[in-house]
């Protein structure tokens, strides 16, 4: 057993190193920017080293466990650990945050605070994915909301205060339900609170109480995912945020909600999940159709991409609701896949805006000729978003399809109906993706503009785009990169379910 506190170092390094930013010499933004990038790279290398040399990939149990007593009064422990379910999101967080920091080069106003908030958000997200104590999970969940709110309200667009307030009201409202669920689970059946996740997993609850806990946790995670009808904060938030913030929102923040559904609703409350799983599948199916049919009506480019995130979340819900190892593995693969694709689309939307200063699709047109590199990368990631074979989105959606078809929980006719509606959603997705490309890159509008000369993608934008594109292609060609991490853990989670 390895007793070195790898996870504690990985969690606290970004925020402590970020605090040093305020004491760096005043020599322009270059020093701050490179210092932040170096911290992110060091963190990613540390994480990769710890996982490669100290994590047993064929062991479904919690590994790299750290347990330190923190507050005696409430039996509160600093308890961290990882398994096959959390290792993928943690590596995704490190990768996307490093590239988002590189993408934030145009930010010059209050650069110290901006980069500190990105590193603080990094710590909160890693802490959420590696927490093995329910109260610590809640604290980390709340902690990373503060940097997001400040990043939105200070460096956003014209309606940034409205979107930031909308975001914090929704997420804080959901967090009330999360806190009630955590305290309810921790205080049940004992005079002393038991917030240890392993103890709570082995605890049995009355069905009525388990359903109440399940609904509370579900509301909290539905806001963050987002799941309709609690998704209305998302388009405004993405529409106003700086694109480096959008990369973190789409790539990591939304995935925390899906992770919470699997980690707590599914693993901690299996009986209630078995009852509610048909509703998850129904909501997921509606979500695919709703978002795919609403997206073409969005004039704002970033809002249209935001609705595609809502549509992709529908596949994750169906995978979670299928209660099969195939479906759940597909949902986990979709979490990782869309983390890359969503971050890349928002990055390219932001770099396009930096050049043409247009955000409404009906004002764009003809960008493909002056910006061929951005056109190529945008087209490639749009194809990945609409699940083109050979890319990660296709494999994830296909595995979810097989998961729901092979599920023993549902009768044949409901499965055929759900599959049919999912197929309609997959047909609608190319419509809004390809129409977005047509409005942006084809036609002649840009040539009629007074300042029609624009620069194409530079080395920085090309490096970020290719860095995200390689894993999208890699996972599409060889999905076992991700599936091999989670397959053993998925079997353990599903061993608690009974088809009754």
UniProtKB/Swiss-Prot annotation:
Keywords: Chloroplast, Membrane, NAD, NADP, Plastid, Plastoquinone, Quinone, Thylakoid, Translocase, Transmembrane, Transmembrane helix. It is a multi-pass membrane protein. Its EC number is 7.1.1.-. GO terms for biological process: ATP synthesis coupled electron transport; electron transport coupled proton transport. It comes from the Eukaryota. It is an enzyme of class 7 (translocase). HAMAP family: NDH1_NuoM. It catalyses: a plastoquinone + NADH + (n+1) H(+)(in) = a plastoquinol + NAD(+) + n H(+)(out); a plastoquinone + NADPH + (n+1) H(+)(in) = a plastoquinol + NADP(+) + n H(+)(out). GO terms for cellular component: chloroplast thylakoid membrane. It comes from Panax ginseng. InterPro entries: NADH_Q_OxRdtase_chain4, NADH_Q_OxRdtase_chainM/4, NADH_UbQ_OxRdtase, ND/Mrp_TM. GO terms for molecular function: NADH dehydrogenase (ubiquinone) activity; ubiquinone binding. Pfam families: Proton_antipo_M. It is found in: Plastid, Chloroplast thylakoid membrane. Belongs to the complex I subunit 4 family. This is NAD(P)H-quinone oxidoreductase chain 4, chloroplastic. The chain crosses the membrane at residues 3-23, 37-57, 84-104, 111-129, 134-154, 167-187, 208-228, 242-262, 272-292, 305-325, 330-350, 386-406, 416-436, 462-482.
């Amino acid at each position: 057993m390895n007793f070195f506190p790898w996870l504690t170092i990985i969690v606290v390094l970004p925020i402590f190193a970020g605090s040093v930013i305020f004491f760096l010499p005043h020599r322009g933004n270059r020093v701050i920017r490179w210092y932040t990038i170096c911290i992110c790279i060091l963190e990613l290398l540390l994480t990769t080293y710890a996982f490669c040399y100290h994590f047993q990939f064929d062991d479904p149990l919690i590994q790299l466990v750290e347990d330190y007593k923190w507050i005696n009064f409430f039996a509160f422990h600093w308890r961290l650990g990882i398994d096959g379910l959390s290792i993928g999101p943690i590596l995704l967080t490190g990768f996307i945050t490093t590239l988002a920091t590189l993408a934030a080069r145009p930010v010059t106003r209050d650069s110290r605070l901006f980069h500190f908030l990105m590193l603080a958000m990094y710590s909160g997200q890693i802490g959420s994915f590696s927490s093995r104590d329910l109260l610590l999970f809640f604290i980390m969940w709340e902690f990373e909301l503060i940097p997001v709110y400040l990043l939105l309200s200070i460096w956003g667009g014209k309606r940034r205060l409205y979107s930031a307030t909308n975001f914090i009201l929704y997420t804080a409202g959901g967090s009330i339900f999360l806190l009630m669920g955590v305290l309810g689970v921790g205080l049940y059946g004992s005079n002393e609170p038991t917030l240890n996740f392993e103890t709570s997993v082995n605890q049995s609850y009355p069905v009525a109480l388990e359903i109440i806990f399940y609904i509370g946790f579900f509301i909290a995670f539905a806001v963050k995912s987002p799941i309709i009808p609690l998704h209305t904060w998302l388009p405004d938030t993405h529409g106003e945020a700086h694109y480096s913030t959008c990369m973190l929102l789409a790539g990591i923040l939304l995935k925390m909600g899906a992770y919470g559904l699997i980690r707590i609703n599914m693993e901690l409350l299996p009986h209630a999940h078995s009852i509610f799983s048909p509703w998850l599948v129904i909501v997921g199916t509606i979500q695919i159709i709703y978002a795919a049919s609403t997206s073409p009506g969005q004039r704002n480019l970033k809002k249209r991409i935001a609705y595609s995130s809502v549509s992709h979340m529908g596949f994750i819900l169906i995978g979670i609701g299928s209660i099969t190892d195939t479906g759940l593995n597909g949902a986990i693969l979709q979490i990782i896949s869309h983390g890359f694709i969503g971050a890349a689309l928002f990055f390219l939307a932001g770099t396009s805006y930096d050049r043409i200063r247009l955000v409404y699709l009906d004002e764009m047109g003809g960008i493909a000729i002056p910006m061929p590199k951005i056109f190529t990368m945008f087209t490639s990631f749009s194809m990945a978003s609409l699940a083109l074979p050979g890319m990660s989105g296709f494999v994830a959606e296909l595995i979810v399809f097989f998961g729901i078809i092979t599920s023993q929980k549902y009768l044949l006719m409901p499965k055929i109906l759900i599959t049919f509606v999912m197929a309609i959603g997959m047909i609608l997705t190319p419509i809004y993706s390809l129409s977005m490309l047509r409005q942006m890159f084809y036609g002649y509008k840009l040539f009629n503009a007074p300042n029609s000369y624009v620069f194409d993608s530079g080395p920085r934008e090309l490096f970020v785009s290719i860095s995200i594109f390689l894993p999208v292609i890699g996972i599409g060609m060889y999905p076992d990169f991700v599936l091999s991490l989670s397959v053993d853990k998925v079997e353990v989670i599903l061993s608690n379910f009974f088809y009754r």
